[in-house]
Structures are given as structure tokens and as C-alpha cells.
Amino acid sequence: MKRVADVLIVGSGVAGLYASLNLREDLEIIMVSKKSVNLCNSSLAQGGIAVARGKEDFQSFIEDTLKAGKYENNIDSVRVLVEESMDNINKLIDLGANFEKDENGVLFTKEGAHEINRIVYHKDITGKHVEDILLENVKRRKNIKIIEDCEMVDIYHRGNRCIGALFNKDGQDLSIYAKVVILATGGIGGLFKKSTNERIITGDSIGVAIRNNIEIKDLSYIQIHPTAFFSKKSEEKRFLISESVRGEGGKLLNCNGERFVDELLPRDIVSKKIYEEMKKTNSNNVFLDVSFMEKSFLQNRFPNIYNKCLEEGIDISKEPIPVAPAQHYFMGGIKVDLNGKTSMENLYAFGETSCTGVHGANRLASNSLLEALVFSRRGALEINSYIDNLELIIEERECEDLDKYRLLNRKILIDEICRLRGDIKDELVTCGGECKKSS
């Protein structure tokens, strides 16, 4: 089966959706989703979106981002992120986003390692709210076609020019050819036994990139979130207890009810302290306590967390939440420039799939959705400016072994992560004996 478009977008999270809305409406766009269109990590982002509160906040925001990233960030990317943050928040509001407000305007909350309150948010479901708003807008665009339940297994290229991609659609091969291809398939959390990510997020684009000699960067930079709800279900998605809970004053306690860390330190430091405390006390988890806060405040500020914990038998207004670290975010990915362009012509990568270098070795809280917005818009605007000069190339291809390539992509990525991070190899899932057959 074969289809054609001006632009092919692989992925339907915030990065992919926002890119499509910033592309010209006279362009034919196909967006492909691995499962249902709204099953993505973007919908799991709870805390909010960081934004510079005016030019006077630029340097502080830049410094907070650099400090969290161990000063291994790309400084040019950080400047772009910060200086273009408010423009993109305003565009989201124009599209229908409804961030929390009081009589003086938009409210800003604080999260770990931010010097000031600069996070806009929608209750404790900011990512889902933004995803829903963007998807509503996309569905109104007649030039955007969505294909669900369709997994990418390879890209097509002529020399160093990307011309399309190959997909597994219901066990059949689907070839989509386009002038420009955008990869926005998210991170690698589905490769870990304990992750806050959706299980389908398995680094598909990154495995494909490695196999096709596209430049990648910082694959060893994997973020562990300090506070995922502790469950004895060993290989299921872990429910995130947002950074904003600590930002509002939540306290981390050991099994003896003692505080042991400054809750607003960067994520990697808090996670390390929790691991040390768990080892010291021979415990599987620590506790995040908000029981001293008003019940009405908790229900209003964190309705999703409040109700989810109740489902697990925990009333957070009366007892602390059992938490433990879990894989959360991937700072590495496909190396891109300031417009999301990869080392292959006419191929872009946005969001967690990409590596802009903006996060350095450790992402600052609430910079993930912001990165997806800022750089996908920049890339879309660049595509708008030159796509009319590109030729659509269609090549006849023989039917591929879809399962072989799917498993090989995963094996290549897992092997590379294990090579770089032998310390976490036991935390990774395997793709079973089938991987050996595909190598």
C-alpha cells in the first residue's frame, strides 16, 4: 500500500501536533500514530510548562536550565528556548489552552531547581489539556490526515535525502512518500521495566536513525524521576507524582518519618538521595507527604493525583504517598540544529525524539513541553519557506520483513544504551529471543 503527502509527521504528541498546526494550510500533511492518536507521553505531563516572565527573567531561566543540565547544554538552544517561550505560550492560549488564573491574570507555580515561580499549568493535567486542545485544532484542519495503529519500521532515502517512511499497518506494509519527514515519536521509556512513560514509547525513531547512519547525541543521558507512585507491579507504567507537588510544599520522608533531602533540588540529585536513603533504611520506597495541606486545596490543585492515589487506597489528605524513582525522560536522541533539522536532508526531529542539547545532562522541570513547542514551531516555519522547491520522489520498493526491522531497531537501541550505561542494563526490558533471529 502506498500514500503520498507534502509532509509526513510520525508521532501525535505535542511536538507532532504543534508542528502540523504551524505548517501552511495549503500543504497536504499525513500524521501517523503508533496506536490511538492521543496515546502518548505528552498526555502524562502533569506539572506545567516553564516560561520566561519577561526579558528580565531571561538570564535567570537560562542559568536554571544550565545548572540543572550540569552546564553540558547547548547554550544557543537554551537561549532560543527561553527567549521564545512566551510567544509559544501565547499561541497556545490563542488555540484555546486554559491555564490557571486569578484576578491578576495567569498563575505561575514553582518546581524544583527554578529560582522563581515561572510554570504555567492546568490543574495537574497540563500535558493532557494541551494535547487535547492541539488535537481539536488539528481535526479541524482539512489538510491534515491522521492514520492510527501504524508503527514506523524504517525510513526511505535516496543518498542522504529522506523521501518517506515504511510502516506496519495491521500487519501489512504501508509506504508513505513525502517531500519532508518529521520524526516525533517520543523517548525510550517503554524499554525500561519501571518508567512513567507509556509502554508503546520504545525509541522507534532513534533505532531507525542509528540503523540509517543519522547522527545521534547524548544517548547516555537518561533522567530518573524521583517520585513515581510505588507499586509492586514490576513491569507496568508507573504513575507520576508531579514535581509540582513538591513545588507546593510536599515533604519527602524516609520510612521513619524523617526528612532527608531538600525537595526542590534538581531531579537527578533528589533521585540519588532517595536511592541512598532506601539503601540505608533497607526500604523499597520513601514517602511524599502532603497530608498537612487542606484537603480542598489538594482536591482542587491535584485532582488527578488525588483520585489516582485514592484508587490505590491512599488518601493523600491523611497519609503520605509511597514513591520511588523511575525512568522518566530521555535527554539524548537524534541530533538536530536550532530548527530541528537532522543530519539527513529533508528529515526533522522534534520533542523527546530529538536532541537539541537544550537539557544538557539533566532536564529542568517543565522544560519538556516547552522544548517540543519552541523547536517544532521553528522547524515548521523553516519547512514552509522552502518546501515548494522540493520534488516528491517515489520509488518502488519490495515488500519488507516488517517484524525483522521492528525488532532490529529495538535491539540496536537497547544494545547501544547498554554499551554506554552498563549501570542500568538490568533496568531495561529485552525484546526476547526474536531479537537474536532479527540480527
UniProtKB/Swiss-Prot annotation:
Cofactor binding mode and count:
Binds 1 FAD per subunit.
Q: Which GO terms describe its biological process?
A: 'de novo' NAD biosynthetic process from L-aspartate
EC top class, as a word: oxidoreductase
Q: What is its main location?
A: cytoplasm
Q: Which domain of life is it from?
A: Bacteria
- Could you say which residues are annotated as the site Important in orienting the L-aspartate substrate? 111
Cofactor(s) this protein requires: FAD
**InterPro entries per record:** FAD-dep_OxRdtase_2_FAD-bd (IPR003953), FAD/NAD-bd_sf (IPR036188), NadB (IPR005288), Succ_DH/fumarate_Rdtase_cat_sf (IPR027477)
What is this enzyme's catalytic activity, as reactions?
L-aspartate + O2 = iminosuccinate + H2O2
Function comment: Catalyzes the oxidation of L-aspartate to iminoaspartate, the first step in the de novo biosynthesis of NAD(+).
> What is the name listed in the Swiss-Prot or TrEMBL entry for this protein?
L-aspartate oxidase
Q: What is the lineage of its organism?
A: Bacteria, Bacillati, Bacillota, Clostridia, Eubacteriales
What gene makes this protein?
nadB
